[in-house]
């Protein structure tokens, strides 16, 4: 069915290649011997390292600038993510806030909540975690049975 199907290599825009070089240069200087490298994706965290990443503008980079986001593309975010993970950077401190909690606040949060939480997330100073469990499920979120009922 797929015999003979060929895909040409994707050519990334020059801006993405430049950003990749910037991230690699940052990591070469920031990932010294004091930084614990991760061998498992998202296993390690360092609040100090997250603040360094935030100072580069690489947390909340696709969010609107009115909330201290970077107004950047998802491709740029992907380039940064790929390099951080590839280098074993300790991203666990800010990962949930950047990838889950922040976007939820952008969509469902009040203006007051957005103004309060999002700038701290983008600076790498505000962290979130998610904990869910119920009987017979443990931390297997796919097996949760609880349902919300509007009252």
Language-model-detected regions and their locations in the chain:
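Glycine-rich, Trp-frequent "lid" loop and neighboring beta-strands that shape
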Residues: 69-70, 89, 112-151
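A cross-family signal for key residues in well-ordered alpha-helices
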Residues: 51, 81-82, 103-106, 128
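Short loop segments at secondary-structure junctions
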Residues: 84, 108-110, 151
């Amino acid at each position: 069915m797929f015999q003979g199907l060929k895909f040409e290599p994707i050519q990334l825009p020059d801006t993405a290649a430049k950003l990749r070089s910037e991230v690699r240069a940052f990591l070469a200087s920031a990932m010294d011997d004091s930084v614990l490298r991760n061998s498992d994706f998202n296993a390690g965290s360092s609040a100090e390292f997250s603040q360094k990443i935030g100072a580069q503008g690489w947390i909340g980079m696709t969010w609107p600038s009115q909330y201290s986001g970077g107004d950047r593309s998802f491709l740029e975010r992907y380039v940064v993510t790929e390099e951080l993970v590839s280098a074993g950077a300790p991203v666990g401190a800010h990962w949930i806030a950047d990838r889950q909690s922040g976007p939820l606040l952008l969509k469902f949060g009040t203006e007051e909540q957005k103004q309060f939480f999002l700038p701290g997330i983008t600076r790498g100073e505000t962290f979130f975690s998610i904990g869910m469990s119920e009987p017979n499920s443990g931390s297997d979120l796919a097996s949760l049975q609880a349902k919300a009922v509007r009252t």
